[in-house]
């Protein structure tokens, strides 16, 4: 296929020009010039004159912008058949963003002179196209457009024997559940455009790199959308030759970068994860076990934006309904890739992230909740919180949030700054404690001088925190992954005898002991309601951010009804099974 034929093929597939007649398309193709650019090349700098527009013939471009803070944000990808720069060309405005080749690419260029010549030949047809293009842009602005194209990954070993070949093979197996996969082994005889044919035939391309900065490794890197570095758990964290060389590639900042820490299959908990944080700009660090295909399936879902995050809200004993919902998700083979929670949801979620059986979680949680708490001088809080802290330390030991195969976070409220504080690192017991410290009832947990309490003050079901963790730091998009939120909080309005002018301690005590007096709220009721009113008022916003929002009918159970854990879990199970059946009839959630 010669360049003219390739240009025609691209134009026919174009969303902007595809509806034009063959005569106009042939004229347009004859006015195009072609250029080959290497991955990482900046082809249209922000602020430069808009003297041309580009069509992608092969490869791909990426639109990006530096924010005032200096952070890099990635926007649309421009793939074969698509164009970029038409708005600036038509309106004669400077470029509003950088456009960079993310792969070795062949581009067709329409210069301003050619554009004006074509307008004189076909004024009505082309003006109609350009007016529609401007209208669409003014109506919707610059948006991230979801497109179907082959996603590509390069698996790079950071040292000899890192296990990149096993990671690439296991990732290929996992991705085959989502589409067609081709796994490229290292090769030295590849032609410059050898990969173009695979773009249209496969959904996922995996390039297996070498532990050296060979020509194959560099070429594979340039073709990849995402980079997966691989190291053995416990390996040196020093920057090696291959990482240093790839870091010098002009397209390095544009790539989404991940780290896989490969562990022996018999490892009970990950090691070394926390020590890698902050050393590199990795989007995520994935501790994976050799031979555990479920770990690689989770990796595949994160890479492709199809991961499932489950958010567990607070609600005292009603939180046992979470166990029923989790059981239903497991039985329906729905993936749970990331767990987050607040208060009781954090306590259950942390144990679930430890891979404990659901029955064990219920029994451990019931024992934990049955312990009393000693009142203290009410200067900071009503109770000391020492028993809860002691038992959480016993429950989780020396585990940190990083020491989990399944990612987890606990949500708390930072009273010092008035924001949600996501606990996704450090001791696991401490993260759960901060999320289970209602303001006024328990003393706040201190973090570098700031006060952390139960997160329900701001958001009892921390969906926003989950959305941020399912998204990617570089890309501006909302749609990554699926969020299943479980809300077990029951809004009960506080009231007192309408004939009273003020609450009475003695009347409240009489009501507590069942003397027949009109029940008046006690300090525990007041503090609990005050701590949940913010989250309750934002429930509509929280629901809108979740893909599936479950509210098991647990109002009949008391906040402190921990002895009814089996009944509560069963209610959650039956409720979830009914709703999951409705989901699967519409849009099925991601399977494991």
What are these regions (language model features)?
Residues 254-257, 262-273, 277-280, 291-293, ...:
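Non-catalytic peripheral regions of patatin-like phospholipases
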Residues 292-339:
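Helix-rich "cap/lid" substructures immediately adjacent to catalytic or cofactor-binding pockets
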Residues 145-187, 308-314:
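Walker A (P-loop) phosphate-binding motif
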Residues 168, 172, 322, 348-349, ...:
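Short helix immediately C-terminal to the catalytic nucleophile in hydrolase catalytic domains
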Residues 199-215, 453-457:
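Switch II (G3) loop of P-loop NTPases
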Residues 313, 335-354:
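Catalytic nucleophile loop
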Residues 207-284, 288, 484:
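Conserved catalytic-core segment of NTP-binding enzymes
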Residues 1-157, 163-165:
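Cytosolic regulatory regions built on CNB/CRP/Popeye-like sensor folds
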């Amino acid at each position: 296929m010669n360049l003219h034929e390739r240009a025609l093929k691209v134009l026919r597939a174009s969303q902007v020009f595809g509806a034009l007649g063959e005569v106009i398309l042939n004229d347009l193709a004859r006015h195009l010039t072609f250029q080959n650019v290497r991955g990482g090349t900046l082809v249209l700098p922000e602020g430069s004159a808009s003297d041309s527009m580009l069509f992608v013939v092969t490869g791909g471009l990426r639109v990006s912008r530096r924010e005032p803070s200096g952070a890099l944000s990635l926007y649309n990808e421009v793939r074969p058949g698509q164009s970029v720069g038409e708005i600036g060309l038509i309106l004669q405005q400077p470029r509003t963003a950088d456009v960079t080749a993310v792969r070795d690419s062949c581009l067709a260029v329409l210069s301003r002179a050619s554009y004006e010549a074509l307008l004189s030949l076909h004024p009505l047809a082309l003006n109609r196209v350009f007016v529609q293009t401007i209208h669409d842009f003014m109506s919707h602005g610059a948006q991230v457009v979801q497109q179907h194209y082959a996603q590509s990954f390069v698996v790079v070993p950071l040292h000899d024997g890192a296990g990149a070949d096993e990671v690439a093979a296991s990732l290929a197996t996992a991705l085959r559940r989502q589409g067609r996969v081709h796994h490229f082994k290292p090769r030295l005889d590849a032609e410059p455009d050898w990969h173009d044919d695979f773009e249209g035939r496969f959904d996922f391309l995996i390039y297996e790199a070498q532990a050296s900065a060979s020509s194959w490794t560099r070429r594979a890197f340039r073709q990849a959308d995402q980079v997966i570095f691989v190291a053995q758990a416990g390996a040196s964290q020093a920057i090696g030759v291959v990482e240093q060389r790839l870091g010098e590639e002009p397209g390095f900042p544009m790539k989404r970068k991940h780290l896989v820490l490969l562990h022996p299959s018999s490892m009970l908990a990950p090691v070394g994860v926390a020590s890698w944080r902050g050393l590199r700009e990795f989007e995520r660090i994935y501790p994976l076990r050799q031979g555990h295909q479920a770990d690689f399936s989770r990796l595949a879902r994160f890479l492709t934006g199809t991961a499932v995050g489950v958010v567990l809200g607070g609600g005292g004993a009603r939180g046992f309904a979470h166990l029923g919902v989790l059981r239903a998700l497991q039985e329906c083979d729905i993936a749970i890739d990331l767990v987050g929670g607040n208060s009781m949801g954090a306590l259950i979620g942390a144990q679930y992230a430890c891979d404990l059986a659901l029955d064990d979680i219920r029994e451990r949680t019931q024992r934990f909740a049955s312990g009393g708490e000693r009142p203290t001088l009410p200067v900071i809080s009503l109770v000391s919180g020492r028993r809860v802290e002691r038992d959480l330390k016993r429950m989780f030991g020396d585990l940190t949030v990083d020491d989990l195969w399944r990612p987890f976070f606990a949500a708390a409220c930072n009273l010092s700054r008035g924001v949600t504080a996501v606990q996704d690192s450090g001791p696991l017991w401490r993260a759960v404690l901060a999320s289970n410290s209602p303001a006024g009832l328990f003393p706040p947990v201190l973090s570098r001088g700031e006060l952390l309490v139960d997160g329900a003050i701001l958001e009892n079901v921390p969906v926003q925190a989950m959305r941020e963790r399912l998204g990617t730091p570089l890309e501006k998009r909302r749609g990554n992954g699926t969020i299943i939120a479980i809300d077990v909080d029951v809004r009960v309005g506080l009231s007192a005898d309408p004939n009273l002018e003020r609450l009475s301690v003695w009347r409240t005590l009489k009501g507590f002991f069942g003397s027949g007096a009109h029940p008046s709220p006690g300090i525990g009721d007041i503090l609990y309601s005050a701590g949940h009113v913010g989250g309750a008022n934002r429930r509509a916003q929280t629901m809108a951010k979740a893909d599936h929002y479950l509210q098991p009918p647990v109002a009949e159970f008391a906040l402190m009804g921990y002895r009814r854990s089996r009944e509560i879990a069963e209610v959650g199970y039956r409720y979830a099974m009914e709703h999951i059946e409705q989901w699967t009839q519409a849009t099925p959630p991601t399977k494991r």
